[in-house]
């Protein structure tokens, strides 16, 4: 069905995601899930539309890296830091819920997301100030991410908020014991940077994130644990926020989320997956993010190895991340994004089917 749609755009994705959420709400006999999704979808549209004026007023404009595809130079001076309008509504919702429930899990989630939000904000702000594509140095950004992640992981592990088990199904789990700590670090820092790398084409990261948040929210519901339902509400809210932002971020983008958005989105996904023991399923849902990240690792690794062996570096892809490879192959930007969305939808369906049947 998905493959037969001639043009799968923002509206198509919203309609499909909304339909899926209505079905999910019906099956779980609770339409609050659809309600928060719709509410935050329109909040996101309203805030982004009006926030664009503020971004333009302060000249928070994107700088394009010289090493990227040449057709991206026309995107220079597109308003950026749109992640502010995505993450602040989420943080306000999370703060309200945290105050009402006084949950240590929610407190840790709030502080972790806020930490990644500030990291992304600093990176974007310095990039704009320096009129360069990079704000914080790679090492500086990694150190900040690492410190925030380690604090979150150690506190959560000490309070037994992170399970040492990686649950594959109700009857099958892998006991990682103390090794869950490096796994948790890899999940949190890895998914954050993977979303960041995916945010290279108009609407790619925002669309995929909206799809993944729906999948993660549904997977948590399938656990049947009442105390975890609040995390489903948070996921569905973020799904609505991402798709609301997508209205202005889809091709041709009027605004970019920047690291303020992408790093925070990854932190939300990783933190919630760790706190709800959903690592395995998230790894399936996030297939696009993971592939994008792996393409960079493979490209850099292969180049360094061949340079050492043959004194001349060789590349597997025309350019990494993977979406740039397809761009240089001549595939239109919107077509690449459309196909990546479709693949992500199939990955979410696969993850949910496995969750139900394993």
UniProtKB/Swiss-Prot annotation:
NCBIfam families assigned to the protein according to its UniProt record, in alphabetical order: mraY (TIGR00445)
Keywords: Cell cycle, Cell division, Cell inner membrane, Cell membrane, Cell shape, Cell wall biogenesis/degradation, Magnesium, Membrane, Metal-binding, Peptidoglycan synthesis, Transferase, Transmembrane, Transmembrane helix
A biological process term (GO) from this entry: cell division
Function field: Catalyzes the initial step of the lipid cycle reactions in the biosynthesis of the cell wall peptidoglycan: transfers peptidoglycan precursor phospho-MurNAc-pentapeptide from UDP-MurNAc-pentapeptide onto the lipid carrier undecaprenyl phosphate, yielding undecaprenyl-pyrophosphoryl-MurNAc-pentapeptide, known as lipid I.
Compartments in which it is found: Cell inner membrane
EC number per UniProt: 2.7.8.13
UniProt pathway: Cell wall biogenesis; peptidoglycan biosynthesis
A Pfam match: Glycos_transf_4
Any one GO molecular function term: metal ion binding
Cofactor(s) named in the record: Mg(2+)
Mode of membrane association: Multi-pass membrane protein
Class of enzymatic activity (EC top level): transferase
Transmembrane segments: 13-47, 81-101, 106-126, 148-168, 171-191, 201-221, 228-248, 255-275, 278-298, 336-356
Reactions accelerated catalytically: UDP-N-acetyl-alpha-D-muramoyl-L-alanyl-gamma-D-glutamyl-meso-2,6-diaminopimeloyl-D-alanyl-D-alanine + di-trans,octa-cis-undecaprenyl phosphate = di-trans,octa-cis-undecaprenyl diphospho-N-acetyl-alpha-D-muramoyl-L-alanyl-D-glutamyl-meso-2,6-diaminopimeloyl-D-alanyl-D-alanine + UMP
Family: Belongs to the glycosyltransferase 4 family. MraY subfamily.
Identification of the protein by name: Phospho-N-acetylmuramoyl-pentapeptide-transferase
Origin species: Prochlorococcus marinus (strain MIT 9301)
Gene Ontology CC, one term: plasma membrane
């Amino acid at each position: 069905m998905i493959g037969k749609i001639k043009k799968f755009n923002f509206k198509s994705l919203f309609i499909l995601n909304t339909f899926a959420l209505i079905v999910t709400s019906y099956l779980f006999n609770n339409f609050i899930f659809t309600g928060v999704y719709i509410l935050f979808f329109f909040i996101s549209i309203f805030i982004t539309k009006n926030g664009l004026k503020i971004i333009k007023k302060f000249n928070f404009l994107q700088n394009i890296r010289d090493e990227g595809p040449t057709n991206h130079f026309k995107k220079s001076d597109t308003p950026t830091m749109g992640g502010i309008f995505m993450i602040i509504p989420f943080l306000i919702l999370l703060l309200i819920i945290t105050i009402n429930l006084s949950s240590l899990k929610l407190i840790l989630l709030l502080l972790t997301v806020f930490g990644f939000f500030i990291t992304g904000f600093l990176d974007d702000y310095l990039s704009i100030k320096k009129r360069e594509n990079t704000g914080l140095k790679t090492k500086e950004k990694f150190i900040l991410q690492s410190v925030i992640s380690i604090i979150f992981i150690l506190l959560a592990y000490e309070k037994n908020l992170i399970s040492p088990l990686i649950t594959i199904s109700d009857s099958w789990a892998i006991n990682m014991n103390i090794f869950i700590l490096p796994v948790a670090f890899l999940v949190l820092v890895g998914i954050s940077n993977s979303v960041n790398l995916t945010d290279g084409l108009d609407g790619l990261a925002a669309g995929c994130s909206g799809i993944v948040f729906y999948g993660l929210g549904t997977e948590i519901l399938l656990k049947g644990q009442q105390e975890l339902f609040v995390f489903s509400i948070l996921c569905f809210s973020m799904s609505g926020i991402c798709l609301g932002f997508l209205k202005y971020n889809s091709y041709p983008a009027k605004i970019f989320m920047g690291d303020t958005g992408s790093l925070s989105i990854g932190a939300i996904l990783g933190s919630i997956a760790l706190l709800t023991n959903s690592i395995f399923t998230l790894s399936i849902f996030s297939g696009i993010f993971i592939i994008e990240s792996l393409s960079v690792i493979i490209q850099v690794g292969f180049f360094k190895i061949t340079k050492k062996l043959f004194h001349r570096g060789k590349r597997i892809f025309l350019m990494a991340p993977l979406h740039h490879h397809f761009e240089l192959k001549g595939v239109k930007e919107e077509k690449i994004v459309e196909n990546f969305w479709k693949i992500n939808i199939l990955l979410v369906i696969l993850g949910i089917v496995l969750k139900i049947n394993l």
